[in-house]
Amino acid sequence: MTTQSLEAEAKALNDKLESLDLAGRLAMVAGLDGRAVFTTSLGIEDQVITAAIGINRLDIEVATLKTGRLFNETVALVEETEETYNILIKRYYPEKADIEAYVAQYGMNGFYESVEARHACCGVRKLKPLARALEGASYWITGLRRGQSGNRATTPFAEADLERGLIKINPLADWDIETIRAHVAAEAIPVNPLHGRGYPSIGCEPCTRAIKPGEPERAGRWWWENDEKRECGLHVAEAASSIIPNASSAA
């Protein structure tokens, strides 16, 4: 698909999705030609989407990135969610050779030392497994919301991901956190217990802290960096330096 046609399809989808509810948005994507993949980090937004996919038995693959540095609570929630909705959540792991190359170059926790080292860690533990999860997909469904951070304030319902050659679908783009929480309570959706301990946004354990009163939702992610740097690269294009020079290039 050309750049122009990808962008045109994304714009048309964005306009159609806006008037639908969550179930309708997901059903529309599930009915399109091409493979649809939802990647979940098991956060509260993602649990809302997973529940909708499971309850409505939609033809959407659910996948998660097992980085090797997740909270125990997150790991436990994967199996609980599978059992609750009778679905399979496919696990994608980093390559052992990539981890070894990262540790040799930066150290196990080198991500605290520089933005380059942190991006490199995300590249190995998230971006490369993500590439495998999305291989051959036409539509990538995410839990992005406009209220999560300033970087995401203009998130559309559908957008062309030219780098990956697919369309990214953000069915919760217009939901605020209060709506999310009310929906979770009403539908008895299982969520990460860390949300109740001051963690509205949860990533890898070494890179996530509880937020302070009045802080933005994602203030606890990579808190030692400037706000504009606080993305892992899944939803923001990364610099070439994010990939370890001597690491395995296997997808």
Curated annotation (Swiss-Prot):
This is Adenosine 5'-phosphosulfate reductase. Its main location: cytoplasm. It comes from Sinorhizobium fredii (strain USDA 257). Its cofactor is [4Fe-4S] cluster. The active site is at C232 (nucleophile). Binds 1 [4Fe-4S] cluster per subunit. It comes from the Bacteria. One of its GO terms (cellular component) is cytoplasm. It is an enzyme of class 1 (oxidoreductase). It catalyses: [thioredoxin]-disulfide + sulfite + AMP + 2 H(+) = adenosine 5'-phosphosulfate + [thioredoxin]-dithiol.
